[in-house]
Amino acid sequence: MRRLLMKGIRFYQRAFSAFSPAHCRYYPTCSNYTLEAINRFGAVKGVLMGVARILRCQPLVKGGFDPVPAHFSLRRNPQYKEEDHRGKKR
């Protein structure tokens, strides 16, 4: 199941995402975040984390650097909450 999900996300990245300008508010992108979460936590938890991340990616949120946390969580990685994608404090 894990491989099938990861292949589906990679297909999306090559077929659709590659032809549109990058507009994700977060780094890494939501699709890359989901790939890493699935790889690290398995299919079910990884998909849940990916869906939670996509739901956070909306106009009322600043975005920034938000890597997959070391432990399963549906919230933004608190270690990087006030930092931008270069790791500098805002």
Swiss-Prot record:
Residues 79-90 have a biased composition (Basic and acidic residues). It is a peripheral membrane protein. The keyword Cell membrane applies. Keywords: Cell membrane, Membrane. The keyword Acyltransferase does not apply. Pfam families: YidD. SMART domains: Haemolytic. It is found in: Cell membrane. Its main location: membrane. GO terms for cellular component: plasma membrane. Residues 68-90 are annotated as: Disordered. HAMAP family: UPF0161_YidD (MF_00386). Belongs to the UPF0161 family. Could be involved in insertion of integral membrane proteins into the membrane. NCBIfam families: membrane protein insertion efficiency factor YidD (TIGR00278). This is Putative membrane protein insertion efficiency factor. It comes from Lactiplantibacillus plantarum (strain ATCC BAA-793 / NCIMB 8826 / WCFS1).
